[in-house]
Amino acid sequence: MISIDPQFIKNFSKKVKQFDKFSLFVHVNPDFDAFGSAFAFKTFLNTFFSEKKAYVMGSYNINADGRELFPFEQTDINDDFVKESLAIIFDTSNQERVLTQKHKLAKETVRIDHHPRTEKFADMEWIDSSFSATAEMIGYLILQMGYKLNDEIASYLYAGIITDTQRFWGPTTTPQTFALTAKLMETGFNRNKVHDAVYLKPLLEHKYFSYVLSKAKITKNGLAYALIKKGAYKHFGVVSPLPMVHALNNIKGVKIWTTVYFNESIKKWIGSIRSRNIPINNFAQMFNGGGHKYAAAFVLDEKNQFMKLVQIMDDFLAKQNENS
């Protein structure tokens, strides 16, 4: 069994027993790891502390993947509840990315995250980038607090793990990831239901995937990139723009791949970078971003900044190729 700082477990367990109200927070544009971690912890509270109340903030009336799996909130949560609650923030590396920003109203805050630490913004934090997913952290936390995993908790954690590890393909997958996954499977949860919720997409989204792939360019140094035009997603019936960086996965000869799209709500260009084994988070940090060693995101004010980033990464690959 993996070891977690015993002082954190002791202090966190005290907080769980002390508070009767919990507001659970995820990052903007929440993915399966964020929602999986939050809903798994909500289910843990409902199972072992049925008298307590917990809500996943921002999941009410949201357009996001996972509606077939996660029981999104049916009502909005008022500020008075948050003010009396322990806020737990999942899978969020910096404060400005917390969905709703209402964690600032909470009586106390806890943050649990597997991204590299960039800032401290909660009263209590457990940050460990050796984990493949925040969902993996939550699974081990529940176990080391002395509780069991049930099939509902397991299904949510599994969704978070398989997406953040890219079905265990990614370099962040470790023996401890497989060890926890084995424990999840022992609960007998319905894997087919999770797989369908995560991977089945409408035909139009598949066409959008093909569109992004058709726009990709590949340099002789092994960089693939695609700039997605403003509003392109609307032609495919997609509800909101997506980074679609996975459209460039698994292309032979490609070492780094990146995409960028225009986010109409914040009026900025949002991009993602991926690689198999080359650290790329430093490139994202140059352009108002960051993330994991092999998976990162960035934010641009102007579209032409994307080509500057592309040039920087391509020059890096050119030098690397010369030295190999």
UniProtKB/Swiss-Prot annotation:
It comes from the Bacteria. InterPro entries: DDH_dom, DHH_sf, DHHA1_dom, Oligoribo/pAp-PDE_c-di-AMP_PDE. SUPFAM superfamilies: DHH phosphoesterases. One of its GO terms (molecular function) is nucleic acid binding. Belongs to the mgp1/MG371 family. This is Uncharacterized protein MG371. It comes from Mycoplasma genitalium (strain ATCC 33530 / DSM 19775 / NCTC 10195 / G37) (Mycoplasmoides genitalium). The lineage of its organism: Bacteria, Bacillati, Mycoplasmatota, Mycoplasmoidales, Mycoplasmoidaceae.
